[in-house]
Amino acid sequence: MAPKKAPAAAEKKVKKAPTTEKKNKKKRSETFAIYIFKVLKQVHPDVGISKKAMNIMNSFINDSFERIALESSKLVRFNKRRTLSSREVQTAVKLLLPGELARHAISEGTKAVTKFSSSTN
């Protein structure tokens, strides 16, 4: 026996009225994980990193960034200027990082800014 067909009225689907509710989207959190991993592979190609260690490194970089930004903004306000320049960032790095580490950070930062400037022109 063939299955019986339902009446035509029963086949129509009931459409719901559009609602103003939005779906909860997963909020993306931006991390430095890919950059940490790239540097790790440059320095030690055969070494891996755990999620916990990656989270610690990410927190360290975020903290360092915040400290440098805060110190730079203080220097701008102290000098009664309105524009944050590379000079204030370099001075903040000198104040926050000890000796050789500060010199190395400044040279790497200068190199990165030069590379960026030449690529945008």
Swiss-Prot record:
One GO MF term attached to the UniProt entry: structural constituent of chromatin
Region annotated Disordered, chain positions: 1-27
GO CC term (a single one): nucleus
Lineage: superkingdom: Eukaryota
Keyword terms, alphabetized: Acetylation, Chromosome, DNA-binding, Isopeptide bond, Methylation, Nucleosome core, Nucleus, Ubl conjugation
Family matches, as SUPFAM superfamilies: Histone-fold
PTM comment, free text: Monoubiquitination of Lys-115 gives a specific tag for epigenetic transcriptional activation and is also prerequisite for histone H3 'Lys-4' and 'Lys-79' methylation. Acetylation occurs almost exclusively in the MAC.
Location relative to the cell: Nucleus; Chromosome
Entry keyword Zinc: no
Family: Belongs to the histone H2B family.
Subunit structure, as described in the record: The nucleosome is a histone octamer containing two molecules each of H2A, H2B, H3 and H4 assembled in one H3-H4 heterotetramer and two H2A-H2B heterodimers. The octamer wraps approximately 147 bp of DNA.
Protein name in the entry: Histone H2B
Organism of derivation: Tetrahymena pyriformis
